[in-house]
Amino acid sequence: MATISRKKKKVKVTPEGAVHIKASFNNVLVTITDMQGNTVSWSSAGKNGFKGSKKNTPYASQVTSEAAAKEAFDLGMRYVHVFIKGPGSGRDAAIRALQGAGLDVKTIKDITPLPHNGCRPPKRRRV
């Protein structure tokens, strides 16, 4: 049974927000929130058409950040604080793409969790 598609409400947001970038070895997730933590826009490499090993490239990270930033910019966001988590390859490209999309980056903070010798890491790949 088909559902009725509703038009998404355009809500104006405060000009200051936070960008959470999670760059894993397999994918890149970018979530833009207001200062209270409510999601304004989000994007991922898979959502932007990248499949498989192309999802963890710097270019995929750039496209993903641009898509999320453009949507937030259209809703009225201008200044962002960036929080980066993970060891992925597209961390720097994501920040540059945010600045290129018109958002003014105020602070950059690395919140990658570091173990105090916790779980044993996966074994090294031999190709």
Swiss-Prot record:
Binding partners and assembly: Part of the 30S ribosomal subunit. Interacts with proteins S7 and S18. Binds to IF-3.
Gene of this entry: rpsK
Record's protein name: Small ribosomal subunit protein uS11
Keywords of this entry: Ribonucleoprotein, Ribosomal protein, RNA-binding, rRNA-binding
Annotated function: Located on the platform of the 30S subunit, it bridges several disparate RNA helices of the 16S rRNA. Forms part of the Shine-Dalgarno cleft in the 70S ribosome.
Entry keyword annotation includes Hydrolase: no
Keyword Oxidoreductase: no
Record GO biological process: translation
N-terminal signal peptide: none
GO cellular component terms, A-Z: ribonucleoprotein complex; ribosome
Domain of life, source organism: Bacteria
GO molecular function: rRNA binding; structural constituent of ribosome
Pfam families: Ribosomal_S11 (PF00411)
The family this protein is said to belong to: Belongs to the universal ribosomal protein uS11 family.
